[in-house]
Amino acid sequence: MHGKFLKKTLQKEGINTDAIVEDPGYFTTLAFVEIGENGERNFSFARKPGADTQLKKEELDQTLISGCRIFHFGSLSLTDEPAESATIEAVKMAKAAGVLISYDPNYRPSLWKSKERAVKKMKSVVELVDVMKVSDEESILLTGAKSYEQAAEEILAMGPKLVAVTLGEQGVLMAAKNRKEIIKAFQTNAVDTTGAGDSFWGGVLCSILSINKPVEKMEWEEIRKCAVLGNAVAGLCVQKRGGIPAIPTKEAVFEFMQK
């Protein structure tokens, strides 16, 4: 029921769902979000196991993966087999085809067998990645660094060409090979931060597509514009409750940026 609802939601937004795999033997993982007074969240999950952990290598659509412009994945598909192997195989397919690889590692303790295993698995794929978004806390968890600035440097050394460390209401640290800078967030009244990081990264990836050049050849001002657009998307997202319902339209984002 929940999976079909989500599929219909995507279709209503004009998103192609042809490659979604349905597994009648497992239910869709459910996330329950508790919202604090400042809009920050606590998560709990129903996943014993969820259908998302059951994706198999043979179910991958190689034509679709090889033909896309950006292949984005997160770390929660690395928690269990067979999805872990399928995810890594999909990333390798995309990379072999010259597709830009985007990665967003999330640490949700209840979905991992241990913190040590989570860190090991989340780090294992970084070398395959071109652009990466990570929170300040998770950047330190991944690297063991003393600060998120140092963590960004260490992540860049692992392979990514561009790293974005999200800093909540402070904005984001954008880091590339020869430069890093904090791009301040738009000041808004946050009621629910669910989806803020995803919205931010969606804005960044949209900008990268519109610039249409290899990330390593982008000028710093172009990288900065990517972050500003991402911050604008996130700034609107946190003003509404919910995940998908709070994601703004492109028109709303540009209007917000002009104010």
Provide a role label for each language-model segment.
Residues 61, 122, 190:
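Acidic, amphipathic alpha-helical patches
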Residues 92, 144, 148-259:
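Conserved phosphate-binding/catalytic region of the ribokinase-like
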Residues 1-75, 254-259:
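Conserved N-terminal subdomain of the carbohydrate kinase-like
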Residues 49-58, 111-117, 145, 215:
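Short gly/ser/thr-rich secondary-structure transition/capping motifs
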Residues 29, 75-79, 234, 240-243:
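Glycine-rich phosphate/pyrophosphate-binding beta-alpha loops
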Residues 9-13, 36-39, 118-122, 149-152, ...:
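Short, hinge-like loop/turn segments at secondary-structure boundaries
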Residues 15, 99, 243:
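Short glycine/serine/threonine/alanine-rich loop segments
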Residues 76-154, 160-161, 170-171:
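Conserved beta-alpha-beta core of the PfkB/ribokinase-like small-molecule kinase fold
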